Amino acid sequence: MSAWRYAGGPSMSDLPLFPLHTVLFPGMMLPLHVFEERYKRMIGACLDDDRRFGVVLIRSGEEVGGSAEPHDVGTIARITGVGRLEEGRMNLLTVGEERFRIVRLSQQEPYLVGEVERISDVHEHFFELEEPAERVAALFAEYYRLTTLMRGGWQRAINLPRDPDRLAYLVAAQLQAPAAVKQSLLEMTSLRKRLEREVDLLGVAIPTLTELLQSARRQRHTGFGVLN
């Protein structure tokens, strides 16, 4: 197996890493603007040989300049589109694939390279997932409605995936939560527990959003009254 090339087995060889202040989930899209020389070199190599790279949340440090310490668990990113700009800069569109865990880090290249192993969820029967998945879908539909109203947008029907795994990753990606919370969802190896955690998070977020929306409406009405 060539370096950096994913073969779909239980393990992988060395993988170039892109530390970000963002969590990428499997099946989700992530646009990237590449401008640092080290990452232009890394992405250039990936494009030349149809290789993947790993997106990892930064534990400490910054995205630009110097070295950042990443979390141990990240997601393989596959490049699906590239726009080349001046001075070798690039706009990328990527999609998350498998999750991985870093076993060992290397700084032999200008960028981080990790020896990684693939991780997956434990096997769980569908009947264990059906009830929490239905609750997540119902709660997220309301959460989506409220966040759309908060932005002043139109209330459009949302078409959620029926597959519990895809649903959990979609909700995790769309949830307005700290990166550390999203990272904890990524690291879970039980889909049922991931769904149950999302039920808890949505259950807290929805009343907060409802109150914020009602408060904004009261302020608008009060303002209109003063003007009149």
List each language-model region with its residue ranges.
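N-terminal low-complexity, acidic/polar interaction/targeting segments
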Residues: 2-228
